């Protein structure tokens, strides 16, 4: 019996309109009633997630910023990692061959010099907003991650540039087709979930996890049961062919799977039924 369930948010637990559906909320409450520990593992900011969970009437442990912050159910900081100050300074002062917008996550919010109100659509539930600022004026310490937003091909080319200049000093992953993230070396959802599991006297074998993007890869591959969304990035499905594919986020595929698992765990699951 698994004791902890970890959920990615965008493309997994959230529907396309960025809400948690009713069937999904019911399934989450059933997990809690069955003694399961809920964990929400996301690239979103802690402040964003607290707003979403408060609005939805659900609570759980939080792995935010793609593993850069781990908090308990009361918001107490359990673990965290920041980018080295010299890397942040290097990224901000280097004239990269790209038109990608740059976004920086810190404990006190989301900072960018790119004013695009369309980016706020995904944060209506929480009312979380970016803060317009000159990025070179931000402190170089205390930065969790740097995000680059642009069409995928442009980001793929930028990723090559970044890796050539920084080598193994940082990690890079696509949290969506149009979002490339720069994270502290060794920082990912899987590593953060392992640290949280240890804090809870569990192992990753005691956990199940759900995800759809490359920032979920380490988490899905290391837990006792990893579930890949039907709408997952093709690269994720290709790199984790051994994992079961369930329904799509817009169909509340997580809820569909959990209802089956809670009622008939001994039967083979199919997302079509």
UniProtKB/Swiss-Prot annotation:
Q: Which residues form a coiled coil?
A: none
EC nos: 3.6.1.-
Q: Which Gene3D superfamilies match?
A: 3.30.1240.10, HAD superfamily/HAD-like (3.40.50.1000)
Q: Which residues bind Mg(2+)?
A: 8, 10, 212
User: Could you name the active-site residues?
Assistant: 8
The molecular function terms of the Gene Ontology recorded here are: 4-amino-5-hydroxymethyl-2-methylpyrimidine diphosphatase activity; magnesium ion binding; phosphatase activity
- What are the required cofactors? Mg(2+)
Q: Name one Pfam family in it.
A: Hydrolase_3
Report keywords, A-Z.
Hydrolase, Magnesium, Metal-binding
SUPFAM superfamilies reported in the protein's UniProt record: HAD-like (SSF56784)
Magnesium among the record's keywords?
yes
Q: Which reaction does it catalyse?
A: 4-amino-2-methyl-5-(diphosphooxymethyl)pyrimidine + H2O = 4-amino-2-methyl-5-(phosphooxymethyl)pyrimidine + phosphate + H(+)
Give the top-rank taxon of the lineage listed in the UniProt record for this protein.
Answer: Bacteria
Outline what the protein does: Catalyzes the hydrolysis of 4-amino-2-methyl-5-hydroxymethylpyrimidine pyrophosphate (HMP-PP) to 4-amino-2-methyl-5-hydroxymethylpyrimidine phosphate (HMP-P).
**NCBIfam families named among the record's database cross-references:** Cof-subfamily, HAD-SF-IIB, PRK15126.1
Q: Which family does it belong to?
A: Belongs to the HAD-like hydrolase superfamily. Cof family.
The protein here is known as HMP-PP phosphatase
- What is the species of this protein? Yersinia enterocolitica serotype O:8 / biotype 1B (strain NCTC 13174 / 8081)
């Amino acid at each position: 019996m698994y004791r902890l369930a970890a959920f990615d948010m965008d493309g997994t637990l959230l529907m396309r309109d960025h809400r948690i559906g009713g069937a999904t909320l019911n399934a989450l409450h059933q997990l809690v009633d069955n003694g399961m520990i809920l964990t929400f593992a996301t690239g979103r900011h802690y402040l964003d997630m607290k707003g979403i969970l408060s609005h939805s009437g659900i609570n759980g442990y939080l792995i935010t910023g793609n593993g850069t912050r781990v908090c308990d159910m009361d918001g107490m900081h359990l673990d965290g990692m920041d980018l080295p100050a010299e890397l942040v300074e290097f990224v901000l002062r280097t004239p990269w061959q790209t038109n990608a917008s740059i976004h920086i996550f810190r404990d006190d919010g989301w900072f960018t010099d790119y004013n695009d109100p369309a980016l706020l659509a995904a944060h209506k539930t929480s009312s979380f907003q970016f803060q317009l600022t000159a990025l070179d004026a931000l402190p170089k310490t205390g930065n969790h991650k740097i995000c680059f937003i642009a069409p995928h091909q442009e980001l793929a080319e930028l990723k090559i540039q970044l890796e050539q200049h920084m080598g193994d000093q940082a990690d890079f992953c696509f949290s969506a087709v149009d979002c490339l993230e720069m994270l502290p070396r060794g920082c990912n959802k899987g590593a953060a979930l392992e640290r949280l599991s240890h804090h809870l006297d569990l192992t990753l074998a005691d956990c199940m996890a759900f995800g759809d993007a490359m920032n979920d890869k380490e988490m899905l591959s290391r837990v006792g049961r990893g579930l890949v969304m039907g709408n997952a990035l093709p690269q994720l499905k290709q790199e984790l062919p051994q994992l079961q594919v369930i329904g799509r986020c817009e169909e509340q595929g997580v809820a569909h799977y959990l209802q089956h698992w809670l009622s008939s765990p001994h039967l083979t699951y199919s997302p079509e039924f």
